[in-house]
Swiss-Prot record:
Catalyzes the transfer of endogenously produced octanoic acid from octanoyl-acyl-carrier-protein onto the lipoyl domains of lipoate-dependent enzymes. Lipoyl-ACP can also act as a substrate although octanoyl-ACP is likely to be the physiological substrate. Pfam families: LplA-B_cat (PF21948). It is an enzyme of class 2 (transferase). PROSITE patterns: BPL_LPL_CATALYTIC (PS51733), LIPB (PS01313). This is Octanoyltransferase. It is found in: Cytoplasm. The active site is at C168 (acyl-thioester intermediate). The keyword Transferase applies. Its main location: cytoplasm. One of its GO terms (cellular component) is cytoplasm. Its EC number is 2.3.1.181. Belongs to the LipB family.
Amino acid sequence: MNDVIIRQLAHLIPYQPLWEAMQTFTARRQSQTTDEIWFLEHEPVFTQGLAGKPEHVLNSGNIPLIRTDRGGQVTYHGPGQLMMYLLLDLNRLGLSTRTFVRTIENTVAESLQEWGIPAQGKETAPGVYVDDKKICSIGLRVRKGFSYHGLALNVAMDLTPFSCINPCGFKGLMMTQIQDYVNPIEMDAVKRTIIPLFLKNFGYNQPAIMVETSLEFLIDDHLRSFSEKLGERETVTNSRQN
């Protein structure tokens, strides 16, 4: 069994600095670094993966479009969507990239089935689906056996922005969310369902769970640039003086 830290960020996070924080964490981690999973919701943003093609962005409008270094094509992130960023040591977990993706899909599907939603993965396309509608997108990057990026699970959100793109590069792909099957639904309830399944399926001990109501945990050297980019430079300075 391996240790893991779960961080739950309690406010909407802009994409760019969060992405840079993941890159920095991954570049500086070592074999003894504890794995981390970050739970959060993003401010509205389209992200274009490494395989992304411009023709799949139909009309981004006023929503920012950021080209990122995860796998896959274009998708949307926004409030009401649960992001799980998986900063894991795949070598330590004994997982190939393919098995890693399948374990994510199976875990998400298992959690949705607990809500009575008949979700499952597809052999032909990463992610989790209910019938032919996509409810969870997966986009990852693995460097030297360390993963970052993760999954986006649609919980209770405005799905309209997905109509401005071909989600994940598939023209006409319909998106769905937990709220379409279980209403009302609370984000915290979804987390309470999915966390134990991730721990079980990935072989983790009971985690240290950090509820981050501020960005003070980002004072650590490997995340200081993230803190500053989010306008927390003054908070960091004050924390060091106290």
